[in-house]
Structures are given as C-alpha cells and as structure tokens.
Amino acid sequence: MKNKNNKLADCPYITLEKALGYSFKDKHLLEQALTHKSCKLALNNERLEFLGDAVLGLVIGELLYHKFYQYDEGKLSKLRASIVSAQGFTKLARAISLQDYLRVSSSEETSKGREKPSILSSAFEALMAGVYLEAGLDKVRKIMQNLLNRAYKRLDLEHLSVDYKTALQELTQAQFCVIPTYQLLKEKGPAHHKEFEMVLYIQNQMYATAKGKSKKEAEQQCAYQALQKLKGIK
C-alpha cells in the first residue's frame, strides 16, 4: 500500500474523528472500518459495511419520518433512496474527507480506488457501524443529523431526488438522438449481500462502469459518471 494521501501513516485518527464528531475507544475497530478488502488483510470492512447498511437505513428513515411529516410513504421512500445510496453516502463521506484515510491496495491506489463511490460509500457504512457498536443508535443519529446539515444546503425531495438516468437520456437524445444502453458486467456475492457491476454505452462507446447493491443503483452511478463527462464536470 502506498502512503501518499494515507493519513493513517502520520496523523492516524484525530482529524477524521474531529470531523466525524466521535472519538473511537477501540482504534482497531476504526482501522478495520477503513480497510478495503483489496488489502488482503485478515480483517476488512465488509462485515461492518453489512451492519452499517441496516443501521443507516433505519436512522435516516427515522430522521426523514420526523422531519417531513407532510410526506406520504412514497415520497419518504424516494427521499431516503437518494441518501441511502452509493452517491448519497459518498457525498457524506467526502464531507469528512474519508477518502484520505482509506486503506486500499497498491492496484486500487493506482486506479484511484479511494475516490470510487463503491469503495467510499462502503467505508462510510462501515464507519457508522463502528460508531453504532461502540456508542449506539443515539450517537449515530446525532452524527448523521450533523453530516446531513453539513453536506446538503437543502434537505428536501426537490433537491435530493435526482434521477440521473432520466437526466442522461434527455441529454443524449438532445445531443446525439440516441438513448444510453446498460449492460450487466458482473454479479457477485451471496444472496443477502449482492454486488452488481454495470457498464453504460452511448453510441456503442463505453462511457462508464459502476458497482451497486442493485442493478438500479449501479445504473444510476453509471449515468452520474456519464453526465459528468458529457457536461465537462470534474
């Protein structure tokens, strides 16, 4: 593993914990949450990611339930899906500069793995699972409320519920008179923890690949990447 931009080497946890608003009692648990499976170490963050997915789904659902009392079940589900996603968790992870602390293999480092939404969002889930195991749901609620306020200028359906696939299709139809196509590249993992990798083509040219916990999530990630390329967003 390279040490470039890996703050575990020089300032292990203080800055990250300050940004998070929580200091881990068990630093090994924190380190595990930051360790991607590519490192081939005895402990990585996959199990914590599994737990964090469930914890965050509950906490965010509860926060939205109380905040948006006027929304029906359909609107609440749509809003939650915008946050409880690879793109949503990546946004929250970047709010605390989590990418700077990830432990990834040399090959992932070379391919900018620490910036990949699939890796970054999974690490965020693992990190919050660690907080839950040490401090419980109340602490997770408090942290998530702070992070949501920090990461989003406005937390409502209009500003959060973005359908990247539809936005991309409208753009490609206007510019190229074609619609994007999506293809399943890989499916792996047990039934309770599937990971799907999709590839997106525009005019038979590959524009993006992305992973997600469902085909729909992976397709949204692909569409988001393609929109960035087409609009020239860095």
Swiss-Prot record:
Catalytic residues in the record: D53, E125
One GO BP: tRNA processing
GO MF annotations, alphabetized: double-stranded RNA binding; metal ion binding; ribonuclease III activity; rRNA binding
Keyword RNA-binding among UniProt keywords: yes
Function: Digests double-stranded RNA. Involved in the processing of primary rRNA transcript to yield the immediate precursors to the large and small rRNAs (23S and 16S). Processes some mRNAs, and tRNAs when they are encoded in the rRNA operon. Processes pre-crRNA and tracrRNA of type II CRISPR loci if present in the organism.
Subunit text: Homodimer.
Protein name: Ribonuclease 3
